[in-house]
Amino acid sequence: MKQELKENQGLPASLLWTLAIIAGISVANLYYNQPLLNRISRDLQTSEFTANLIAMITQIGYAIGLLFIIPLGDLFKRKTIILINFTVLVVSLLTIALTPYIHLILFTSLLTGICSVMPQIFIPIAAQFSTPETKGKNVGMIVSGLLTGILASRVVSGIIGEYLGWRFIFFVAAGMMVICVIIIMRVLPDIPCNFKGRYSDLMKSLFSLVMEYPQLRISSLRAGIAFGSFLALWTSLAFKMEQALFLRETTL
C-alpha cells in the first residue's frame, strides 16, 4: 500500500525494508556474470578476453548510469525512472539468457549496467524523508542491502551456474526484476522532482561541484582506483583459479 511521504517526517519501516531488499536484488545484476565467465566462454566458443569484456562492459554501463541516469531523479518523477529502468533490465536479462550471440550479450550487458543504478536513487529517498534522528540508520540500511546483493550475487550465480547452467541465473534475475516492478508500482508513492530547469543545466551543476570541491575530486579518484583494482583482480581470477586449481563455479 502506498503511503504519503513528507520530507524529514519519517520513512515507514515496511517501505525502508522494501527499498533495501530491492536495492540488493537490483545491484546483483552487475555481478551474476563474474563467476560464470569461463563457462560462458566455453559455451559460446569465444576467447577468455572476449568473455572478460562482459564483466568490464557491465561495469562501464554502471558508471554511465551513475553519471547520466541518476541525475534524472531530480528532473523527473523518481518512480517513473525506476520503473523504466527495471523494465529495460528485464528485457536485457532475458536477452542475455536466450541469445547465442556474444556481441548481443555485450550490448545487453551494457544496458544491464546502465539500468542497475537504481539503488543510488533509493539512498537519497531514504535521506530525504527520514527524520533527522534516523537518517543515518536508514541510509545505512539501504547501503547494507546493496552490499549484501553484491556479495550474495556471486555465490548464488556460481551455485546455479554449476548445476543448472549459466543462462538459468539470468532467467531467475529477470523474474525477480518483474516482481520488483510490481512491488514498486504498488508501494512507492510518487515523489515530485525538485529541480526546475533543463537536463543540460543539471549536468552543468554536477560538474561545477567537481570543480568547486577538491575533496570530492580526491574521493572520487580514490574510489574509482580502488573499485577498478578490485574488479581487475576478481574478474580475471576466476579463469586462473579454475585452470590452475580446478575449482568449480560453486567454489569460485
Regions found by a protein language model. Give the residues of each.
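Residue-level signature of mid-helix packing/kink "hotspots" within the transmembrane helices
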Residues: 31, 59-67, 117, 150-151
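Juxtamembrane intracellular "pre-TM" segments in multi-pass secondary transporters
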Residues: 2-9, 189-220
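Cytoplasmic helix-loop-helix junction between adjacent transmembrane helices
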Residues: 108-144
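Pair of pore-lining "gating" transmembrane helices in MFS-fold secondary transporters
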Residues: 12-32, 110, 213-232
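Extracytoplasmic
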Residues: 17-48, 119, 233-238
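Conserved MFS/SLC helix-loop-helix module at the cytosolic interface between two early adjacent transmembrane helices
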Residues: 64-102
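Interfacial helix-cap and linker-helix signal at transmembrane-aqueous boundaries
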Residues: 40-41, 72-73, 152, 156-164, ...
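Helix-loop-helix hairpin linking two adjacent transmembrane segments in secondary transporters
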Residues: 104, 141-186
